[in-house]
């Protein structure tokens, strides 16, 4: 299996934005056409790809039931190309402890991001990788989530029995195969009866229409409705959500109904969401993803204030959807080549999570960028190959324990605006958004926080 990136790249617009890129494309087209003609027999740009690996049929794993919880955890992670199930046993055990000490949501895609092609040929299933990943999730006390993406090549114009991984993230199922994709979704649901939450597709991949310069919300929604019906037929208690579309923004102003100091949202994403809201068969939650960074100027007006975008979008989604639970399937806060220290990285993440909690997000899933090799792993939850806990793991555990969905927040005053706070009856978290020591009175007590320090403090509530 050719690896898919363990971490999504910095958000890029799906349409050309640079003249230089356009000129380069023109130069390359002729060569590509000649190459394609020599290859012959390819369809929709699919190369032959590798032969999909299909082993002996395995019985469905017997998975532990998710732990009973008083509140929905709200916080969690998405497993990517490399995760704990790919690590040596000792490292996997340490990661299991990091993830399981406070049960949180854990999400896995059905194709790519660590697992192979689930149905290489029509009716021929291969769940070995997915079984392994779901088994680890259950062993680490996960509340499991599955993302129904991506789709086998034969549903997208490629060859049955082969997988062209270069097309995994760029091509959607053809309309004549929407029913086949829905059947695959139902087969997955039957394979893993302990999984009760499904997100349909990922980032509208393959649903951008260059001829109209907008998202193909009609095509996506048609596919979504078929998947929704198929999953509910397997088990009416299964929760299903979409449209899982990326919401991009720009610093420059444009015609959009949603804007703030953090930028202006691309109206085309909002239009696609509203189409889905109006034409969906049903939904148990609404899913989006996005970055605090604008496409043209990074984080504006600064790295911390830019996180206000998440709260503003969440409020808009709740209003437009009739207050459906809002899920952020991914969120990103760090510009390319930022040079941030790990302390600043985690402080900005904490600021984003405060925005999520204050705006009433039901679920926020952290895209865990684990890597294969030992060495620097910025933003990871544990050190690759060693299993040592990294700061982001503690942040997620703390928010999961103290700020699950439904917890009642309390207002806490800080005498210095550089110290952001989030509080409930029993616990307070403070974030120094400055690169300097800050002394402030918070919740009636004087504190001094180091640069970018995150500090938890008990409040003594019942």
Q: What would you call each of these model-derived segments?
A:
Residues 1-15:
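Terminal targeting segments of Actinobacterial cell-envelope proteins
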């Amino acid at each position: 299996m050719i690896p898919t990136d363990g971490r999504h790249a910095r958000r890029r617009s799906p349409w050309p934005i640079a003249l230089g890129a356009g000129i380069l494309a023109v130069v390359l087209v002729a060569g590509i056409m000649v190459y394609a003609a020599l290859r012959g027999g390819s369809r929709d740009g699919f190369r032959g790809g590798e032969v999909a690996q299909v082993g002996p049929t395995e019985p469905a794993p017997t998975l532990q039931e998710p732990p009973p919880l008083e509140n929905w955890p709200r916080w969690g992670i998405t497993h990517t190309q490399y995760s704990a199930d790919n690590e040596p046993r000792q490292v996997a055990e340490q990661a299991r402890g990091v993830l399981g000490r406070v049960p949180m949501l854990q999400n896995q895609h059905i194709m790519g991001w660590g697992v192979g092609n689930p149905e290489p040929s029509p009716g021929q299933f291969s769940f070995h990788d997915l079984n392994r990943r779901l088994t680890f999730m259950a062993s680490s006390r996960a509340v499991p989530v599955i993302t129904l993406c991506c789709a086998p090549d034969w549903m997208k114009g490629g060859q049955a029995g082969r997988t062209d991984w270069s097309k995994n993230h760029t091509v959607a199922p053809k309309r004549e195969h929407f029913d086949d994709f829905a059947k695959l979704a139902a087969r997955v649901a039957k394979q893993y009866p302990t999984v009760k939450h499904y997100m349909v597709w990922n980032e509208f991949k393959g649903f951008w229409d260059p001829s109209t310069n907008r998202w193909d919300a009609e095509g996506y929604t048609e596919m979504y409705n078929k998947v929704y019906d198929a999953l509910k037929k397997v088990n009416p208690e299964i929760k299903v959500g979409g449209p899982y579309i990326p919401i991009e923004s720009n610093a420059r102003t444009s015609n959009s109904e949603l804007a703030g100091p953090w930028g202006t949202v691309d109206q085309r994403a909002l239009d696609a969401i509203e189409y889905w809201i109006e034409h969906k068969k049903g939904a148990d939650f609404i899913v989006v993803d996005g970055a605090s960074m604008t496409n043209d100027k990074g984080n504006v007006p600064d790295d911390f204030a830019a996180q206000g975008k998440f709260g503003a979008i969440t409020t808009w989604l709740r209003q437009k959807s009739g207050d459906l639970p809002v899920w952020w399937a991914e969120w990103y806060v760090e510009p390319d080549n930022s040079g941030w220290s790990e302390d600043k990285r985690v402080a900005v993440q904490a600021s984003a999570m405060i925005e999520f909690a204050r705006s009433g997000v039901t679920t926020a899933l952290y895209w865990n960028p684990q890597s294969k090799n030992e060495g620097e792993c910025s933003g990871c939850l544990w050190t690759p190959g060693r299993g040592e806990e990294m700061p982001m793991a503690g942040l997620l555990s703390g928010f999961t324990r103290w700020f699950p969905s439904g917890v009642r927040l309390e207002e806490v005053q800080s005498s210095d605006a550089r110290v952001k706070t989030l509080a409930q009856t029993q616990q307070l978290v403070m974030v120094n958004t400055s690169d300097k020591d800050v002394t402030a009175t918070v919740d009636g007590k004087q504190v001094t926080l180091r640069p970018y320090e995150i500090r938890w403090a008990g409040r003594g509530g019942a």
